[in-house]
Amino acid sequence: MSEVLPYGDEKLSPYGDGGDVGQIFSCRLQDTNNFFGAGQNKRPPKLGQIGRSKRVVIEDDRIDDVLKNMTDKAPPGV
């Protein structure tokens, strides 16, 4: 994983005119090889796979009651 390291002290510059204002400093990434994610070398999906989602299993015992109650009454403000 990348570590964020500040530049050297010579790169620090004060921020603002007053002495009570803190300092602003820049930082850089030490290792930027995996910065954009590891999936850059993966092949793009085939045309038939675009937009297809994986099957979702809902494991909630109350889902039938919730769906039934949603169809019985209209949402407020309609």
UniProtKB/Swiss-Prot annotation:
Q: Where is this protein primarily located?
A: other
Q: Which Pfam families match?
A: CaM-KIIN (PF15170)
GO biological process, alphabetically ordered: long-term memory; positive regulation of inflammatory response
Domain of life, source organism: Eukaryota
Annotated keywords: Cell projection, Protein kinase inhibitor, Synapse
Q: Where is this region: CAMK2 inhibitory domain?
A: 41-68
InterPro entries of this UniProt entry?
Answer: Camk2n (IPR026779)
A single cellular component GO annotation: synapse
The entry's localization annotation reads: Synapse; Cell projection, Dendrite; Postsynaptic density
Molecular functions per Gene Ontology:
calcium-dependent protein kinase inhibitor activity; protein kinase binding
* Subunit structure comment from the entry: Interacts with CAMK2B; the presence of Ca(2+)/calmodulin increases the interaction but is not essential. Interacts with CAMK2A; this interaction requires CAMK2A activation by Ca(2+).
Job description of the protein: Potent and specific inhibitor of CaM-kinase II (CAMK2). Plays a role in the maintenance of long-term retrieval-induced memory in response to contextual fear. Modulates blood pressure and vascular reactivity via regulation of CAMK2 activity in addition to regulation of left ventricular mass. Mediates the NLRP3 inflammasome in cardiomyocytes via acting as an inhibitor of the MAPK14/p38 and MAPK8/JNK pathways, thereby regulating ventricular remodeling and cardiac rhythm post-myocardial infarction.
Instruction: Write out the similarity annotation.
Output: Belongs to the CAMK2N family.
What protein is this chain from? Calcium/calmodulin-dependent protein kinase II inhibitor 1
The primary gene name is: CAMK2N1
